[in-house]
């Protein structure tokens, strides 16, 4: 008689988050990588990884922005691939500082580059997180025309993250208008994706927001400024703006 394997996947017992860091954050607002900024971010992540499973998507805007390069006459696909390579450089920088902080880290790239990163395999990423490792996803989606916001939403869904954490520079959440231009702008503590889309509030790009909305994935938009904000966001403390399906 044939034996049927009825083993089921164990349910995750810890909170699992997907942290989205822009290239501008990694660069400290300048071109390239700002070591002190990345070191500070790594220490904040390290303070939370014993309690929470963490995956990270990193942008590449501190090196290249495909959309901007294409406006200057470069082929959009080629420009986007340059941006993807920029994200991998940021991943390696963050990996280095995380490991200096005592956190075992893996980089997974959507573009094969076996000497510096693993291939992107969702099941393997989940296993790494279950073992207490941080996983950093690089090279975007491995395809042109996809923003790293969209990649953050997609990766979060594929590794079964509980929430997407959007780290922002210069703003501490979502406002009714640009607070730098409109002094009457009010900060929103809670916002639905429907409201954000209807009012054209640019939390992240529309493709990413729609993906989160359709799959009931919540998001927290918070400011990088403030002592320990990255740690607090990872641990699930209330800060910034909660965007809900």
Curated annotation (Swiss-Prot):
Any idea which GO molecular function terms this record carries?
ATP binding; UMP kinase activity
Free-text activity regulation comment from the record: Inhibited by UTP.
Give one Pfam hit by family name: AA_kinase
As recorded in UniProt, its EC number(s) are 2.7.4.22
Instruction: Output the GO biological process annotations, alphabetical, semicolon-separated.
Output: 'de novo' CTP biosynthetic process; UDP biosynthetic process
UniProt superkingdom = Bacteria
Q: In which pathway does it act?
A: Pyrimidine metabolism; CTP biosynthesis via de novo pathway; UDP from UMP (UMPK route): step 1/1
Look at the named UniProt entry and state the broad enzyme category this protein falls under: transferase
Spell out the InterPro entries in the cross-references: AceGlu_kinase-like_sf, Asp/Glu/Uridylate_kinase, Uridylate_kinase, Uridylate_kinase_bac
Keywords, A to Z?
A: ATP-binding, Cytoplasm, Kinase, Nucleotide-binding, Pyrimidine biosynthesis, Transferase
Where can this protein be found? Cytoplasm
Q: Which family does it belong to?
A: Belongs to the UMP kinase family.
Q: What does this protein do?
A: Catalyzes the reversible phosphorylation of UMP to UDP.
Name-wise, this protein is Uridylate kinase
* Provenance organism: Paenarthrobacter aurescens (strain TC1)
């Amino acid at each position: 008689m044939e034996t049927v394997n009825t083993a089921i996947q164990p349910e995750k017992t810890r909170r699992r988050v997907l942290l989205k860091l822009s290239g501008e954050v990694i660069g400290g607002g300048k071109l390239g990588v700002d070591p002190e900024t990345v070191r500070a971010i790594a220490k904040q992540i390290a303070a939370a990884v014993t309690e929470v499973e963490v995956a990270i998507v990193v942008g590449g805007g501190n090196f290249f922005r495909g959309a901007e390069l294409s406006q200057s006459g470069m082929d959009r696909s080629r420009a986007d691939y340059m941006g993807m390579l920029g994200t991998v450089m940021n991943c390696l920088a963050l990996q280095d500082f995380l490991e200096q902080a005592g956190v075992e880290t893996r980089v997974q790239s959507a573009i094969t580059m076996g000497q510096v990163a693993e291939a992107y395999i969702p099941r393997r990423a989940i296993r790494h997180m279950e073992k207490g490792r941080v996983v950093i996803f690089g090279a975007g989606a491995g395809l042109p025309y996809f923003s790293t916001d969209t990649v953050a939403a997609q990766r979060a869904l594929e590794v079964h993250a509980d929430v997407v954490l959007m780290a922002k520079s210069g703003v501490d959440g979502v406002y009714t208008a640009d607070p730098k231009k409109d002094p009457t702008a009010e900060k929103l503590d809670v916002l639905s994706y429907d409201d954000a889309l209807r009012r054209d509030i640019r939390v992240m790009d529309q493709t990413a927001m729609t993906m989160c909305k359709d799959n009931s994935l919540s998001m927290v938009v918070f400011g990088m400024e403030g002592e320990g904000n990255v740690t607090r966001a990872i641990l699930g403390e209330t800060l910034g703006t909660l965007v809900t399906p």
